[in-house]
Amino acid sequence: DTDRSRGLGDVYKRQVLSGGFVSKAPMYVMRGAMPIRSMSYYMNCWWLKYGVRMFGKWMIPSVPFKEAYFLEDALKFRAALPDAPLIYVGGLVSRQKIDEVLDSGFDAVQMARALLNEPGFVNRMKQEQQARCNCGHSNYCIGRMYTIEMACHQHLKEQLPSSLQKEIDKLEKK
C-alpha cells in the first residue's frame, strides 16, 4: 500500500538485517533443505558432482523453514534501534506476514523466493488481503543458482529429469 511506503525513495539509506552469507551458511540464511541432487545435476566437474552427492547433506545441513524466520531476532534490533531505518528480510511469502512485519516498525521488506516464484506477487497483494505465493520451499532455485541461472522449477520451459522432480516433490511434502 502507498500509505506504508514512508518515503522509500531514499531506500538506499536503510539497513538490511541479514542472517549472514549464503556462501558460508546457505540454509541458515535461506532455510529449508538444499536439494543436493538438483544442485549436483548441473555441475560440470564430475568429481565435484559425485562428491556433493555423497557428502552434501552433511556439508549443507537443513534448517527448517518457518515464515518470517528472522523476525524474532529482527525485533530485538528494532527495539534497540528505534529510530534506525531498517529493512526486514527472511522468509516472507504472504501479505499477512508482510503486514505484521511492517506493523512492527520496519521501514520496508525485502523478498527473493516469493518474487522468483511469482514475479507479480506484489501486484497480487494489492488486490488480495490473503495473498500468499506458491513457493513450496524445495529450494530448487537455490540448488541451481551456483551453476546456471536461478529459476523456480514451477516456471521452467524444459521438463525436469524425473530424479529431480522426485527430489522436489519429496522436499515440498515436508
Describe the predicted segments one by one.
Residues 2, 19-20, 91:
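Short, well-ordered beta-to-alpha junction loops that form the rim of enzyme active sites
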Residues 19-23, 115:
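Glycine-rich beta-alpha junction loops
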Residues 1-12:
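Single conserved hydrophobic/aromatic residue that forms the stacking wall/gate
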